[in-house]
């Protein structure tokens, strides 16, 4: 929306439009907010909601900010000129400005200007000629600040708080547009996908605030003024839900509203939003006394010889992290440790503190020595005397004090900067710190996962690079752990369902975990309409299954009684022939899809499973399996047991799955199918009936419970253990180790002792070692 045309009143939602906007409404023209809402609903893209562009702006944000600051410092102010500059600044913020405009200096300058203009507006009478231009200046500056925060929170370093921009986007929408059913908007699929993604990110952010509030707070505190807009989110979601005509999207909006309520509670609990009794002070935007929202002052306080220290009482209070007088923005503190000194510049950039804290957490470094030290630290944390900032202070002091110590290297980067590497519990920690002429540490940072070497000092950097390769390289190239997982599924109490995952458990969606599961495929398998299957599909009138099929469908199935089809595609053609061309093709397709869902598991072939799109609200079983590993269930009704398998390589596990998938692809090509259960002109059978029967006989079938009499039947545990067993056998043979038999993670992993034959279509053989040989 164009900030120059909008004036937000303290209690209005949505914002009212002035002048040209009202005339546009009278002439049935679209307001800027309606245009952006239509574009966003159609595309589902975040930038569309804010009117942002990916192209670079003609105006440079930093230079405009400096010009506007100088104009505000003049003795005689020209508010129309200032309003025009503020409008240009807001427009520049919508384009790609690079990363320089997201620095702390630019953020503090912009927030200071907003605070100054709001204070002056509060002291200006509404009848004054300067009131309207000044109000536009405030609105445009707030718009620029919003885009500044959005740009930073959508960056890779702020991935944990990515849900906040999504929620802010929903506040910008005009809910009436949804009710109008605009021309050309035939579907709400993209909008619904965005809502589902926002809900998932909101839930993840709430969980991170519960499990690790310090790290998330460090990312959100610099944007405390922006996230205050989230107070309007419940009303915005209620309006969108009321006006949305699409039922699935409306249900997703209700679910998002529930997740949002939990998030707002967590934000208030961590003093990132005002408490309920303070909300009224936020709504009154024109208060005389203004307070500047600043980052928490994570100063580096006095540290003893062992690196321990205490925080000042003022910095330990949560309320001091959200609000501080304007003069506090430039305050800092310094302290010394023997041989080194730690200064307060690190506190000036919350992103630096977050990076250093993440490095400390990665290496599990702690000051505590023994049980007594850990108890002391726990008591200090409960009393508010230890937070992320204080731990970063001690960590920087520890790293800077490593010169000349075993397992530590120092590399001169120039301009007082040093790169320090120290071995901590078998892992190499890496930071950069800067010293002044007195040897006092005045700044520190984490150089990133792949730090750049200083130009001209490549030869001197050899020792440090060698140390990093020795520890960090080994860590980066270490083999991926493999876990056998058993969990309970819907309707079951005990964890009988089994599968294998390569990755690190309980690390969320971005952990990179890979699912290696085998299960029944409802779109692949024969259909034999014998008496048993007919009774299951048609059955009695009071049968639960038969009641799900209409009378014409039952009649068509009965007409095919006794027939046997090698593939689902053959059954599809026969069913369509019985139903005739008078029936709509889409209706016939839906009928057959319903039949496929009701076919017994015993008619399904066993193939590797694939995880679906993680953004969907109701994922299929493979995606639920992966989610249970990435976020271990905490509910009492959900159980997941893990067993780490040591003698296996994830690459061998991948090869085993590829071998199984090769069998699937070969069989699909020979039988003329594409995995959808629907015949296609592009896929025609390439074998005769005799060869087809041989292929079908070599295909493993799903059988839930033992006894599994042959290596061509099994369940999910059988498939998972077969893949894992093949990978373990490959690993033990390569490393001359004794054979090892794979077992499930739970005693309820029924079928894990049985093995499937993984057939190789290239030579016609199967890996059908008996489980007794292992």
Swiss-Prot record:
Biological process per Gene Ontology, one example term: biological process involved in interaction with host
Location relative to the cell: Secreted
Keyword Zinc found: no
Function according to Swiss-Prot or TrEMBL: Induces hypersensitive response (HR).
Gene Ontology CC annotations of this record: extracellular region
Organism: Pseudomonas syringae pv. maculicola
Major localization class: secreted
Bias kind Low complexity: ranges: 9-23
Record InterPro entries: T3SS_HopW1-1/HolPsyAE (IPR029378)
Family according to the record: Belongs to the HopW family.
Gene this protein is translated from: hopW1-1
Entry-linked Pfam families: HopW1-1
Protein name as it appears in the record: Effector protein hopW1-1
């Amino acid at each position: 929306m164009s900030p120059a045309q909008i004036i937000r009143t303290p209690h209005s939602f949505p914002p009212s439009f002035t002048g040209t906007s009202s005339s546009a409404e009278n002439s049935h023209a679209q307001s800027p907010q309606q245009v952006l809402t239509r574009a966003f609903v159609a595309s589902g893209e975040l930038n569309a909601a804010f009117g942002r562009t990916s192209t670079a702006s003609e105006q440079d944000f930093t230079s405009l900010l400096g010009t506007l600051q100088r104009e505000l410092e003049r003795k005689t102010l020209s508010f129309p000129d200032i309003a025009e500059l503020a409008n240009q600044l807001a427009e520049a913020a919508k384009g790609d400005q690079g990363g320089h405009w997201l620095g702390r200096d630019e953020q503090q300058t912009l927030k200071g200007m907003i605070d100054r203009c709001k204070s002056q507006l509060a002291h200006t009478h509404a009848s004054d000629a300067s009131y309207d231009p000044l109000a536009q200046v405030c609105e445009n500056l707030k718009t620029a600040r919003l885009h500044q925060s959005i740009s930073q929170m959508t960056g890779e370093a702020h991935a944990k708080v990515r849900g906040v921009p999504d929620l802010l986007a929903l506040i910008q929408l005009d809910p009436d547009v949804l009710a109008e059913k605009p021309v050309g908007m035939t579907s709400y699929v993209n909008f619904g996908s965005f809502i589902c993604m926002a809900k998932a990110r909101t839930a993840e952010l709430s969980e991170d605030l519960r499990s690790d509030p310090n790290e998330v707070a460090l990312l959100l505190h610099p944007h405390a003024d922006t996230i205050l807009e989230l107070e309007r989110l419940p009303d915005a979601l209620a309006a969108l839900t009321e006006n949305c005509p699409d039922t699935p999207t409306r249900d997703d909006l209700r679910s998002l509203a529930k997740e949002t309520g939990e998030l707002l509670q967590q934000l208030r609990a961590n003093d990132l939003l005002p408490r309920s009794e303070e909300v009224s002070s936020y709504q009154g935007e024109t208060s005389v006394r203004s307070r500047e929202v600043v980052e928490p002052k994570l100063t580096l306080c006095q540290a003893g010889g062992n690196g321990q220290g205490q925080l000042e009482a003022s910095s330990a209070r949560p309320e001091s992290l959200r609000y501080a007088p304007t003069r506090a923005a430039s305050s800092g503190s310094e302290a010394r440790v023997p041989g080194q000194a730690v200064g307060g510049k690190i506190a000036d950039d919350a992103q630096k503190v977050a990076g250093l804290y993440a490095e400390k957490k990665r290496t599990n470094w702690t000051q505590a020595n023994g049980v007594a030290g850990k108890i002391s630290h726990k008591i200090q944390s409960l009393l508010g005397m230890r937070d992320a900032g204080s731990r970063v202070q001690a960590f920087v002091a520890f790293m800077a004090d490593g010169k000349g110590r075993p397992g530590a290297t120092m590399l001169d980067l120039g301009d007082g900067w040093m790169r320090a590497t120290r071995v901590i519990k078998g892992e190499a920690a890496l930071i950069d710190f800067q010293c002044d002429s007195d040897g006092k540490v005045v700044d520190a940072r984490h150089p990133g996962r792949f730090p750049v070497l200083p130009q001209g000092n490549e030869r001197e950097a050899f020792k440090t690079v060698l140390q990093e390769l020795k520890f960090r390289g080994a860590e980066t190239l270490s083999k991926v752990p493999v876990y056998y997982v058993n969990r309970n599924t819907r309707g079951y109490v005990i964890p009988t369902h089994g599968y294998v995952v390569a990755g690190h458990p309980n690390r969320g969606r971005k952990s990179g975990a890979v699912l290696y599961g085998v299960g029944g495929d409802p779109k692949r398998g024969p259909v034999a309409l014998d008496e048993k299957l007919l009774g299951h599909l048609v059955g009695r009138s009071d049968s639960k299954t038969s009641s799900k099929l209409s009378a014409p469908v039952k009649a068509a199935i009965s007409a095919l009684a006794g027939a046997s089809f090698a593939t689902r595609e053959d059954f599809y053609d026969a069913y369509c022939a019985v139903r005739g061309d008078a029936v709509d093709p889409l209706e016939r397709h839906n009928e057959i899809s319903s039949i496929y869902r009701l076919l017994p598991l015993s008619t399904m072939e066993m193939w590797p499973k694939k995880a679906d799109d993680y953004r969907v609200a109701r994922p299929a079983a493979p995606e639920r399996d992966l989610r249970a590993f990435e976020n271990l269930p905490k509910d009492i009704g959900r159980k997941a047991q893990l067993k780490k398998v040591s003698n296996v390589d994830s690459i061998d596990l991948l090869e085993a799955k590829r071998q199984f998938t090769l069998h699937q692809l070969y069989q699909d090509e020979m039988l003329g199918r594409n995995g959808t259960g629907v015949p296609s002109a592009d896929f025609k059978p390439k074998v005769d009936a005799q060869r087809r029967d041989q292929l079908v006989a070599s295909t493993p079938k799903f059988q839930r419970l033992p006894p599994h009499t042959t290596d061509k039947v099994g369940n999910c545990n059988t498939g998972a253990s077969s893949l894992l067993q093949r990978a373990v056998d490959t690993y033990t043979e390569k490393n001359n180790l004794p054979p090892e038999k794979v077992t499930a993670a739970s005693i309820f992993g029924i079928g894990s002792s049985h093995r499937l034959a993984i057939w190789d279509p290239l030579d016609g053989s199967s890996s059908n070692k008996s489980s007794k040989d292992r």
